[in-house]
Amino acid sequence: MIKKRSILIVTRKSPLALWQAEFVKQQIENSHPHLACQILGCTTQGDRLTTEKLVDSGGKDLFVKDLQKALLNRDADIAVHSIKDMSACDGPELMVGAFIRREDPRDVLIVKGELSTLPPHAVIGTSSPRRQCQLKKFQPGCKIKEIRGNVGTRLAKLDAGHYEAIVLAAAGLKRLGLENRIHYYFDPHEFIPAIGQGAIGVECRSDDHEMQTLLKSLDHRETRLCVTAERAVNEKLGGDCFTPIAAHAIIKNDQFSLFAMLGKIDGRVIIRATEIGNSEEAKRIGFKVASQLLEQGGDSLLRELKQ
């Protein structure tokens, strides 16, 4: 029997991250029967910081850096990430070799009781500045309370009565078979999702041309174009996970549309921009939308947020 070549996949150990890695594993093995994939679970620095706010500890990059370190040290061949956890720009030594077909990108509200009985001053759990900003516009009287942990942990905290509602990504709930917990889907044009939300990125080394060729079979063109435009917005703005920035691109009837927002965390200021164009110019459209945000006062707002 010919021994199959082994591909080592590194990922976080959370149930959602392991689901995503297993999905990528199956896609690779189905497309390349001569390959066998092995998943290596990694507890990242972000996972270890269970009580501190991410904004006080280095941001969402803490969920990515340890996985990237494994790639650079050649302890793994590929890393599987949630795109929304990644920086806007790839470093010179690493690249996203495949964008997996995007799941539902919307944010959703999960309520402890019934949506109809949610009080105007409800305690809503989220740690995302983007969600906090838009929640204050959606439900001005609500009280925002920090929440950390994976999907299961957050749902358990809601069920235990620490919150009256929480906001999560629809994609994670659907992938884990928890769609029945969703009470309300936010309109992505009004409550704009995180950059790359719902998309999985498979990262590899820039000098590993064999792996890049292999990953092409997994790459979903429409997802790549949409995420490229969204990431370009943040690349030009220079925001981080502490900045209330959102961008969401869609392709419908051959029309490419990009929506973006920049705001203050208290929701008192929200700047929006929209652009329609050719999907082949995804990055240029992203830069153009970012420029529109800056021209509407986003430049001074960013300076204020970074002080």
Swiss-Prot record:
Pfam families: Porphobil_deam, Porphobil_deamC. Tetrapolymerization of the monopyrrole PBG into the hydroxymethylbilane pre-uroporphyrinogen in several discrete steps. Binds 1 dipyrromethane group covalently. It comes from Coxiella burnetii (strain RSA 331 / Henzerling II). GO terms for biological process: protoporphyrinogen IX biosynthetic process. The gene is hemC. Pathway: Porphyrin-containing compound metabolism; protoporphyrin-IX biosynthesis; coproporphyrinogen-III from 5-aminolevulinate: step 2/4. This is Porphobilinogen deaminase. Monomer. The modification S-(dipyrrolylmethanemethyl)cysteine is found at C241. Its cofactor is dipyrromethane. Its EC number is 2.5.1.61.
